[in-house]
Amino acid sequence: MSTRAFKNAALCLAPILTIGTLISASALAADPLGSLVGSTALGKQLKEDYGVKVYGWAQAGLIYNNNSTDDVSKQAFFNTDEGFNLNQFALGIQRSPASNVQGRIGPFPGPMPQEADWGFNVTTVYGKDARYFKTYGWDEDLGVNRDNKPEDEAFTIAQAYLEFYFPVLGGSDLMLGIFHTPLENEIGFALPSPAPTDFYSHTYSFMHGPAKHAGALYSFKLPSAPGESMLGFEVGVVQGWNNLQSENHDPHVIANVRWRSADFGTWVDWENIYGNGGGDSFANCACGSPMPAGTEDDTAQRYETYLTISHQLDPANRIAVETSYGKQKNGALAGFANKTDATWYGANFNFHHKLSENLSWNSRAEWFYTDAPVHVVMANIDSRTGIPDPSWGSFYAVTTNLSWLPIPNLRLRPEARYDIHSGPGRDAFGDGSRDAQLVLSFDATVFF
């Protein structure tokens, strides 16, 4: 990428940095999410009288790689192109029920609220990342997206759900609608801490999981005495991966277990999803499941599981280990490895060190393996011919960054990531010319 191109891209970031400064100067709320509208008379009334918060964030970044192509996939996921990327411009409105258990997060300490309550969430996202939040049968055919190329910005209604709290068992939460997946250590939205969004790029295990679901998710906490550890469970029935309209008409089942230590410093999360993936991937809209398998009339069972253990060592240091395993029957790309089914698994280790109140250092190491190609991002599909030339085998990645919040509403993050691919098929990086690649990035996120 040329110096001139970097200067032009830096000019694109300038408005985001300026907006962050203005928002922080005018915002009165301690929470950066909702601070812009929350500082107005209307926002205060919505929050105080109805418990409703209007919030948003804007994320953009610059990316550079060490080869002659502009291809920064797969290790820069969500990003694919070198240069400037408007990743996410999101707007949301929500009301959270008073509860001691939160769907997708788990149980919390404290007494169980004795009254039922309700809430809702609607989150819209525009940008390069939004294409990964499209839901087949919901927002893939919106007019604003209809003529888009796969690499273009998209608009999605990423979440639209109702939420109900019931004072049963140790506390229960029911979500109905379209919501971000409860699986994986990382999440796709560029939210502020303490959300697990410490890196600009994402892991291979995150890439190989679902982004969102349409259906129902029931979460509950077992009764526990003050000072005891907490145990929660989640059970869900959804329309597969990233689908509202299931072509094979077979629901997927989610089953998760979440344990929290009494001091809330250690978390254990075991997350699972199982169902028929036959015909649930759609090339014409680049949506649905990213793992094509058979047709809607086929049975192509898909299973994925994640186990994440995180621990707060002390006020300044936190670690997390995630392992994952998945299997796709009758994978459409598995034949390139002379297989019928595809299996993938891996592990990643995360270390987070707080240097000061507004500066942290984050590092991550990952190993990931696929015995056959399964994911469309790894398929390297020729845009002219539609013919895949996939990569598979072992992937090794090391990522490190600094996350700085000069003001509560603005996160600045320089990041370096180095990946190595060892395996058959096409070299994974540099448009098929490299088996290793260095990616440097800088992203800015404004919370409002």
Annotated model-derived regions:
Residues 28-168, 218, 352, 366, ...:
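Beta-barrel outer-membrane channel/assembly domains of diderm bacteria
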Residues 75-78, 133, 145-150, 262-448:
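Outer-membrane beta-barrel pore domains
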Residues 85-90, 117, 155-159, 211-215, ...:
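Transmembrane beta-barrel architecture of outer-membrane proteins
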Residues 103, 185, 372-374:
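Short Asp/Glu-rich motifs
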